[in-house]
């Protein structure tokens, strides 16, 4: 019986003590270890299984952490974490107080650059390489590992374009598996496919034309071949590029056959690969599905409706429309800047454009939102999925900045629905005709109405622009909520001893604010509490404070929301507790709120 090798590897120095012929066994053990832990603790499975051999080869050939290794996005970095001093606490991955699901500089010296968003690795590694040269270190290696979906993003090309005119000691490794979270799209994907199939002559190679020493494509699961090629490239100075071909989910049959589902499958059987299905009976719908079903229903009736997503057709549920109306629903790849300006161009031609981008990823297209959309007052409909705290993906993925970064933009309307009905109704209302851009923000996960699809779906009501509503009367304190966090207020008031003293107002329109109802609130209540699931600085509460100051009101105002710090990973409920906006914290607050 073979002895266990992985349990004796604490860091890459231990890995390098092994004979090369032992590394295949390490790969088998590492792949199985990832499967066993992720099957119970959840996480990003497929990407990490696909680069097991590459991970081992990199840490075996290069002198990490002296040589600097940057993983793009980080979905594929579980093997890297396990081999770099975190095997024993890998079971805490993505849990509150545990290790991050992504490389993180403050966590470990082997994590040279914090990642989570796409296409940053080449620029980061190039920056490190140029810095090393300026410091007189000409031997240090700088490696960027990037996927075929990420390299199609504009920022990756910017990095390649710069690197190609330097003599920086950088190695870019393209992990080509033809899929990101969803299948890769675009002309570059077709080009890479032709290269893999041997149909593209080497003299036409796009990477060689950028002055990189190009090699490949080679089998990314052939450890001896990988090691041999990395050793060869290590001796070459200047920009180098290695194209490897891998299979996402390698080593688990179901993950290889259903790569989208097994990107992050939840809990599953480590032996059979079967996903432990959760019963969805009597559960509310996911907000993403409310969007997906509603836009498809509206698009069937209105030929001007267009849907756009940057590489998130499944996660946004725009896939419903893409499957039925493919000519009017577009996955543009990991290209948020392009997605926004594409939407703007369509809007100039009187199309009704729903641009669905995760809140955290719209940050990548901020200039386009201002310059190409708002400045021209084009009626683009931004649907910001994953707004608020998203949970285990942590600080890189929380959608907590959108209210603050959008509220300052002229012409921009911001709407945060309380529930599924408000979401479908605002999606309906905007296609009736608007003369300004609007951002509709809603969270990851499920709503609050189990019977929405049967009782409410398709029964549309027009929403009046800028109107807030009183959900509950009170005598002493007014609670003003923006968005789905208002459901925590509703639940807390059911259990608060002095609920009769507390009024609740739903401000779905964060911009423009309902000044009429605000004026009534400030004249009626001495104390006002605002609550949001975004940052407090510059958010909804700040807008209420600005109204108060400009109208010379002296009321006591308490702002609840996300504090001025980056919130780490954990369940949404755990993170809401940290920010004191969960139901229990609100019950405690309301119990003292009228004193």
Predicted feature locations:
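Glycine/charged-rich beta-loop-alpha catalytic/anionic-binding loops adjacent to active sites
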Residues: 32-39, 100-115, 137-143, 319-333, ...
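Cofactor-binding active-site loop characterized by glycine-rich and histidine/acidic residues
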Residues: 26, 45-166, 287, 305, ...
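Non-catalytic terminal/interface segments that mediate subunit docking, oligomerization
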Residues: 252-362, 368-378, 460, 480-483
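Glycine-rich ThDP/TPP pyrophosphate-binding loop and its adjacent helix/strand module
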Residues: 111-269, 274-284, 288-293, 412-525
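N-terminal amphipathic, basic-rich helices that act as targeting or association modules
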Residues: 1-83, 208, 217-223, 240-243
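Peripheral docking tails and interdomain loops at the edges
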Residues: 270, 275-279, 391-393, 413, ...
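A glycine-rich helix N-cap at a beta->alpha junction
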Residues: 89-99, 165-179, 374-386
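Active-site nucleophile and cofactor-binding loops and adjacent substrate-binding regions
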Residues: 42-51, 71-75, 103-124, 146-150, ...
């Amino acid at each position: 019986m073979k002895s266990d090798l992985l349990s004796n590897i604490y860091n890459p120095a231990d890995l390098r003590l092994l004979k090369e012929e032992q590394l295949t066994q390490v790969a088998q053990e590492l792949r199985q270890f990832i499967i066993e832990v992720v099957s119970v603790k959840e996480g990003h499975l497929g990407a990490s299984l696909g680069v097991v051999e590459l991970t081992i080869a990199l840490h075996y050939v290069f002198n990490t952490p002296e040589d600097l290794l940057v993983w793009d996005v980080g979905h594929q970095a579980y093997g890297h974490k396990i081999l770099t001093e975190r095997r024993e606490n890998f079971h805490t991955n993505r849990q509150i107080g545990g290790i991050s699901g992504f490389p993180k500089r403050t966590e470990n010296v082997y994590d040279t650059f914090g990642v989570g968003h796409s296409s940053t690795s080449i620029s980061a590694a190039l920056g490190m390489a140029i810095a090393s040269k300026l410091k007189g270190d000409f031997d240090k290696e700088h490696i960027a590992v990037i996927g075929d979906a990420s390299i199609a993003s504009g920022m990756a090309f910017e990095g390649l374009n710069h690197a190609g005119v330097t003599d920086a000691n950088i190695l870019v490794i393209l992990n080509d598996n033809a899929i990101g979270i969803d299948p890769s799209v675009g002309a570059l994907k077709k080009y890479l496919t032709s290269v893999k199939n041997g149909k593209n002559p080497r003299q036409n190679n796009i990477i060689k034309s950028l002055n990189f020493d190009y090699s490949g494509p080679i089998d990314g699961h052939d450890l001896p071949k990988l090691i041999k090629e990395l050793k060869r490239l290590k001796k070459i100075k200047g920009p180098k590029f290695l194209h490897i071909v891998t299979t996402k989910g390698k080593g688990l049959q179901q993950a290889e056959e259903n790569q989208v589902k097994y990107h992050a499958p939840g809990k599953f059987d480590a032996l059979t690969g079967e996903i432990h299905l959760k019963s969805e009976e009597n559960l509310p719908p996911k907000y993403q599905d409310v969007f997906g079903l509603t836009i498809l229903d509206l698009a069937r009736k209105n030929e001007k409706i267009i849907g756009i997503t940057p590489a998130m057709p499944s996660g946004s549920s725009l896939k419903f429309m893409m499957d039925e109306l493919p000519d009017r629903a577009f996955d543009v790849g990991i290209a948020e800047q392009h997605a926004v300006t594409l939407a703007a161009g369509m809007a100039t031609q009187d199309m009704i454009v729903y641009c669905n981008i995760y809140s955290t990823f719209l940050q990548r297209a901020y200039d386009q939102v201002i310059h190409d959309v708002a400045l021209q007052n084009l009626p683009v409909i931004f649907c910001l999925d994953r707004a608020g705290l998203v949970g285990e993906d942590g600080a890189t993925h929380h959608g907590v900045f959108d209210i603050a970064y959008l509220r300052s933009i002229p012409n921009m309307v911001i709407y945060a629905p309380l529930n599924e009905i408000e979401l479908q109704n605002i999606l309906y209302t905007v296609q009736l005709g608007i003369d300004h851009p609007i951002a509709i923000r809603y969270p990851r996960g499920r709503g609050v109405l189990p019977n929405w699809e049967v009782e409410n779906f398709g029964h549309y009501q027009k929403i009046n622009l800028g109107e807030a509503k009183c959900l509950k009367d009170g005598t002493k304190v007014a609670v003003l909520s923006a968005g789905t966090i208002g459901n925590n207020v509703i639940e807390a008031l059911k259990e608060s001893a002095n609920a009769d003293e507390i009024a609740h107002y739903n401000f779905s329109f964060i911009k423009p604010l309902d000044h009429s109802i605000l004026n009534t609130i400030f004249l009626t209540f001495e104390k006002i509490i605002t609550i949001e699931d975004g940052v407090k600085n510059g958010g909804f509460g700040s807008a209420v404070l600005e109204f108060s100051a400009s109208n010379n009101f002296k009321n006591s105002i308490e702002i609840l929301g996300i504090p001025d710090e980056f919130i780490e990973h954990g369940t949404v409920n755990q993170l809401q507790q940290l920010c004191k906006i969960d139901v229990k914290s609100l019950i405690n607050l309301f119990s003292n709120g009228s004193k």
